[in-house]
Swiss-Prot record:
Belongs to the thaumatin family. Induction: By phytoplasma infection. SUPFAM superfamilies: Osmotin, thaumatin-like protein. This is Thaumatin-like protein 6. InterPro entries: Osmotin/thaumatin-like_sf. It comes from the Eukaryota.
């Protein structure tokens, strides 16, 4: 499965809700893809 996380908010968010993501931070508009 492929999971795409996008931060649509104005602030930086941590993608810590996804264990595989390792809690990386996403700036506004950034995406992270996990497979």
């Amino acid at each position: 499965a492929i999971f795409t996380i996008r931060n649509n908010x104005q602030q930086t968010v941590x993608a810590g809700a996804v264990p595989v993501g390792g809690g990386q931070x996403l700036d506004x508009g950034q995406t992270x893809t996990l497979d």
